């Protein structure tokens, strides 16, 4: 399955993605992330590693995916990416990605995305609340969401990654 998580800067996209990766890793699943996550079942990778045909099955987190697989990347992109995005299931991979808006993301990735999640965050002094609503990707932001939830911020999630970590654009993904 491929899921996109969208929201403005500071609205909890990476937090939500890291929370999901930690939950999967806690259950014993191998996970990979381009953002360093402090968990024994999460391996840090770079974007080029994602197209490696020998990457073992698992859950992959692509944070700020629009920096590498942006809407304008089509002609510059290495063909290995199109192969990967069309066949993640065959490789035993699920993909979670974050971006500030779905329009910034490569069309092929958007078209292959099962669900899009819109994140919001509210700070109430001592408590921070995160909320997410999901739609099938082709219905994103239209009508009643297919799923929704909210939860209080988790210190464990916050401590497992650096919210200031900047994704470096690796030119190796281009032709």
PLM features per residue range, with description:
Residues 5:
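Hydrophobic anchor at the beta1->P-loop junction of P-loop NTPases
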Residues 32-56:
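Short glycine-rich substrate-engagement loop in P-loop NTPases that contacts/grips substrate
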Residues 63-65:
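Walker B catalytic acidic pair
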């Amino acid at each position: 399955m491929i899921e996109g998580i969208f929201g403005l800067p500071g609205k909890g996209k990476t937090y939500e993605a890291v929370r999901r990766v930690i939950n999967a890793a806690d259950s014993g699943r191998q996970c990979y992330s381009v953002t360093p996550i402090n968990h024994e079942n999460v391996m840090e990778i770079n974007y080029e590693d994602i197209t490696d045909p020998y990457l073992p099955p698992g859950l992959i987190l692509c944070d700020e995916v629009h920096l590498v697989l942006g809407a304008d990347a089509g002609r510059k992109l290495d063909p290995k990416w199109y192969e990967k995005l069309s066949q993640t299931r065959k490789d035993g991979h699920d993909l979670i990605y974050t971006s500030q808006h779905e329009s910034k993301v490569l069309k092929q990735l958007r078209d292959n995305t099962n669900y899009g999640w819109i994140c919001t965050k509210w700070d109430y002094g001592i408590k921070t609340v995160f909320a997410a609503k999901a739609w099938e990707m082709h219905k994103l932001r239209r009508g009643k969401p297919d799923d929704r939830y909210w939860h209080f911020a988790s210190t464990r999630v916050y401590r497992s990654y650096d919210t200031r970590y900047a994704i470096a654009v690796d030119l190796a993904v281009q032709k």
